[in-house]
Curated annotation (Swiss-Prot), chain A:
Acts as a sulfur carrier required for molybdopterin biosynthesis. Component of the molybdopterin synthase complex that catalyzes the conversion of precursor Z into molybdopterin by mediating the incorporation of 2 sulfur atoms into precursor Z to generate a dithiolene group. In the complex, serves as sulfur donor by being thiocarboxylated (-COSH) at its C-terminus by MOCS3. After interaction with MOCS2B, the sulfur is then transferred to precursor Z to form molybdopterin. This is Molybdopterin synthase sulfur carrier subunit. GO terms for cellular component: cytosol; molybdopterin adenylyltransferase complex; molybdopterin synthase complex. The lineage of its organism: Eukaryota, Metazoa, Ecdysozoa, Nematoda, Chromadorea. InterPro entries: Beta-grasp_dom_sf (IPR012675), MOCS2A (IPR044672), MOCS2A_euk (IPR028887), Mopterin_synth/thiamin_S_b (IPR016155), ThiS/MoaD-like (IPR003749). It comes from Caenorhabditis briggsae. The modification Glycyl adenylate is found at residue 84.
From Swiss-Prot, chain B:
Its EC number is 2.7.7.80, 2.8.1.11. This is Adenylyltransferase and sulfurtransferase MOCS3. PANTHER family: ADENYLYLTRANSFERASE AND SULFURTRANSFERASE MOCS3, UBIQUITIN-ACTIVATING ENZYME E1. Its cofactor is Zn(2+). It comes from Caenorhabditis briggsae. InterPro entries: MOCS3/Uba4, Rhodanese-like_dom, Rhodanese-like_dom_sf, ThiF/MoeB/HesA, ThiF_NAD_FAD-bd, Ubiquitin-activating_enz. The gene is moc-3.
Amino acid sequence: MVSVKVLFFGEAFQLVGKREETVEFPAETDYEELRRIILEKYPALSKIEKVMMLAVDQEYANPGDRFELERFTEIAVIPPLSGG
Amino acid sequence: MESKDWVAGISKSDAGRYSRQLLVDDFGVSGQKNLKNTAVLIVGAGGLGCPVATYLGAAGVGTLGIVDYDRISLDNLHRQVAYKEDQVGQSKSQGLADNVKLQNSGVTTVVHNVSLDSSNAMEIFKNYDIVCDCTDNVATRYLINDVCVLLNIPLVSGSALRWDGQLSVYHYGPDCPCYRCLFPSPPDPSSVTNCNEGGVLGPIVGTIGSMQALEVMKIAAKLSTTLAGKLLLFDGREGKSRTIRLRKRDPKCAVCGDEPSITAPIDYMLFCGAGAHDKIENLKLLEPSVRVNVHEYQEIRSAARKQFLLDTRPPVEFEIAHLPEAIDITLNECRSLQAEELSSRLGVDSQTSDVYVICHRGNDSQRAVKLLKEKLGSIHFRDIIGGYEEWALKINDEFPLY
């Protein structure tokens, strides 16, 4: 397992109530597992599950992607904003 | 050679007017000429549309089209900086076009004072080279995306809420994704917060709108360093921005994929389950027996010695104004707190029979009554129809409307 910083943007911040938090993930993982762990740890995010993007080290994560996480990896939870 | 011969890359008047941007590397004379030959459509003449139109007009864009059906209101002015107090009540699209024209008479402006929908979008968009999404709602964002893909127009998309902004360029180049590649299905309407509910700071929309104008100038000047395929996240509270590299175009995308299923605009209100505006919906979640109107509540509170009133609004709104008997317990707290905690915060005991619930406009109060009934079954919870807004309109015109 490895501790990784998870960042919450926009509505994800509103739902979780934190800008960032350190979360434990398996060092070798994939997109599906990242999503599952994040949604289990932060059930409030289920509200935006359909539109929730994940980015790993500032790169959009696609279904099926595999990741080797390290101590300085950053995972961002990004829902779209629609106001203007 | 005569002394009056010269080779002109640009007219004398344009050289004089735009000299400071002609001097910028990689923009220069060719960028200026390209910008002058470009027609840009701005959809939404609000907090984003104001800076986009103002900067593109000033920079000398050839044609600027502005779509908006709405009128200027007083609570727009803190962020929609192109408008003046004496324009309240007037058309936004006309007001913004007038403003651009006043600043730079060389720009051709086109006013589209309509509500953009599936029936008119293709006809409006087809005359433009670049489209800017400066709108405030999800349904219109999908409509704009689809029409840009169908007509093969690059889309410069900005959005903002509270302290945050997002910016990207969609459908620009063969690998560039569209909005649907990223969000194939729309958000649950109950999870979408708009600026009317969540608020937004002027400089946030100002920053994102200014950057949208800059992306348009780069596309017009044919520079390769645009935000196509990238998403810029701006966090104004922390003063940080991050740029995320996005996925490539999805070959299975319903509109820009290899075998698209969307070949003409669809019904976006049906698709999103929400209207094409950012106005507040009037929900009816409760039976009339568990609701009172503001007149009834006024009688109840003047008759009773002690009245229990639960106020579901967030602390920032509670601070703007509240009734003296109101106890602030937010909708989220109604959801998360246990029965005992709720009772003690409210100050109710086993003798208490009635508690009234109020919010800003009467939607969250209904959601709260449903949650509270589950947790404190012995108490009769009722919501106040229309909330503080109705109270201000019908009972006390001194109470702040916001």
